[in-house]
Amino acid sequence: MTGKTHVTCSTATMAVFALAHKSGYQFFGVDILPWVGVISASVGALLPDIDIPQSRLGQKFKFLSKNMKHRGITHTLLAPTILLLGTLSIKTRNACIVASLLVGLLVGMMFDARVDLRKGNIFVKLKNIIVNKKGLTSTVVLLVLTFIAPATGASILWGLMCGWTLHIFEDLFNSKGCPILYPFSRGHIHIASFKTRHWSEGLFFLLWIGGTIIWALIVIKTQL
């Protein structure tokens, strides 16, 4: 699936979930702000494809994408599990601040074209990562939210986990599948055979969004 398909499908799914839990959500005893999770899920939906040199993140992190096999370790349940543990353990404001800073920097690296980690020495690279408008704006917004609502940090990690997990689930509908049982098995599992950049991906997109719209209508009806 392309990045646009992953982001659109994952964000739409999380948006309906947030609509269903707009008054708040408890995730294993941890307070979650669903709409904060929607935003971070849109970022999380792109992260697994850091192993593709042509992807937005892969271009930023060439040293990773060139040495990683596509649909390898990033398409297992390892990262979502780590994010799950982080979500359950991030209960202090200091931890929330650290999470906000890291996600803000990540957003800057992903969406600011001026951040090129292939150029300059280590100090130039650090400057480019830290000093960019999109990254700084994201960081400031997240930090403000952290002080207004202490649940922001956990919500960010929860959203990243959901976005990453949805990406993997969506790729299970691709003919190449994912090694979700790694390290117990390296075999790729798939439940359908839709192909990337093929008319069948468009069909997958329509079916997914159609199902999301139906779910949204059911949620709205139950709330009336």
Protein language model features and the residues they cover:
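N-terminal membrane-targeting hydrophobic helices
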Residues: 1-224
